[in-house]
């Protein structure tokens, strides 16, 4: 049975939650062994897949979880706004570390390596390709190039202002066009994740609301301070 077929079964049984275990950089939680522990806890709680950034984190996580891992490498480039898995070497390193799915930036922005080249390299390793997109045009272009999974990950992050709510309209548009959509980006409550599924998402990735303790504390602190002002 193919990995996609296995995921279809798991999503039908468990609801389609993917947990992104990416601690705040330099946080006390930003250690491979802690990332792996969070991933294992998420798997035991019913997550159908895990999203991991960085080769060391992926290696540590691969050793303890059996669910599929979506691997990425983030870089801050001087000559490109693209941050997610920008190089062939990143794809190779993630494949070697045990990723099942490799996600790349799928936006139409200047980049060191074309999207189609990165997709071909992912498929060379026999892995599934996911593209993190920001618009319907991005997603449909990546689907035509052969990406098996389209993420709404970058919606709201390629524009001057980032909205507070997730982009459900993008989920629906891509789903209606026949894409296998992972809704991602600002899904900070179970209700929002459920809305994404109702709008046609194949699965939903949740990160900050589950694995970024600093963000969660900030949300509570902000709300509570407002209540007493």
Curated annotation (Swiss-Prot):
Enzyme Commission (EC) number: 5.1.3.9
Keyword match Isomerase: yes
SUPFAM superfamilies in the record: Ribulose-phoshate binding barrel
InterPro entries: Aldolase_TIM, NanE, RibuloseP-bd_barrel
GO biological process: carbohydrate metabolic process; N-acetylmannosamine catabolic process; N-acetylneuraminate catabolic process
GO cellular component: cytosol
Protein origin, superkingdom: Bacteria
Pathway membership: Amino-sugar metabolism; N-acetylneuraminate degradation; D-fructose 6-phosphate from N-acetylneuraminate: step 3/5
Enzyme class: isomerase
Reaction(s) the record says it catalyses: an N-acyl-D-glucosamine 6-phosphate = an N-acyl-D-mannosamine 6-phosphate
UniProtKB keywords: Carbohydrate metabolism, Isomerase
Function summary: Converts N-acetylmannosamine-6-phosphate (ManNAc-6-P) to N-acetylglucosamine-6-phosphate (GlcNAc-6-P).
Name of the protein: Putative N-acetylmannosamine-6-phosphate 2-epimerase
Organism: Escherichia fergusonii (strain ATCC 35469 / DSM 13698 / CCUG 18766 / IAM 14443 / JCM 21226 / LMG 7866 / NBRC 102419 / NCTC 12128 / CDC 0568-73)
Lineage of source species: Bacteria, Pseudomonadati, Pseudomonadota, Gammaproteobacteria, Enterobacterales
């Amino acid at each position: 049975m193919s990995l996609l077929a296995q995921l279809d079964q798991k999503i039908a049984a468990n609801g389609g939650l993917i947990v992104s275990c990416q601690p705040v950089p330099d946080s006390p939680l930003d250690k491979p062994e802690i990332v792996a522990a969070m991933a294992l806890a998420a798997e035991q709680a019913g997550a159908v897949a895990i999203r991991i950034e960085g080769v060391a984190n992926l290696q540590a996580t691969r050793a303890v979880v059996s669910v599929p891992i979506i691997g990425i490498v983030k870089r801050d480039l001087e000559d490109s706004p693209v941050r997610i898995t920008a190089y062939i070497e990143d794809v190779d390193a993630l494949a070697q570390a045990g990723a099942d799915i490799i996600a790349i930036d799928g936006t139409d922005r200047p980049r060191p390596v074309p999207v189609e080249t990165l997709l071909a390299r992912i498929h060379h390793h026999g892995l599934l390709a996911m593209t993190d997109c920001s618009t319907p045009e991005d997603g449909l272009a990546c689907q035509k190039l052969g990406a098996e999974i389209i993420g709404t990950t970058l919606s709201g992050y390629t524009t001057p202002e980032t909205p507070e709510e997730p982009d459900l309209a993008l989920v629906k548009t891509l789903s209606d066009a026949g894409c296998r959509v992972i809704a991602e980006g600002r899904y900070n409550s179970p209700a929002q994740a459920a809305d994404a599924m109702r709008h046609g998402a194949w699965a939903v990735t949740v990160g900050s609301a589950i694995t970024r303790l600093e963000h969660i504390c900030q949300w509570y602190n902000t709300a509570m301070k407002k209540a007493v002002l």
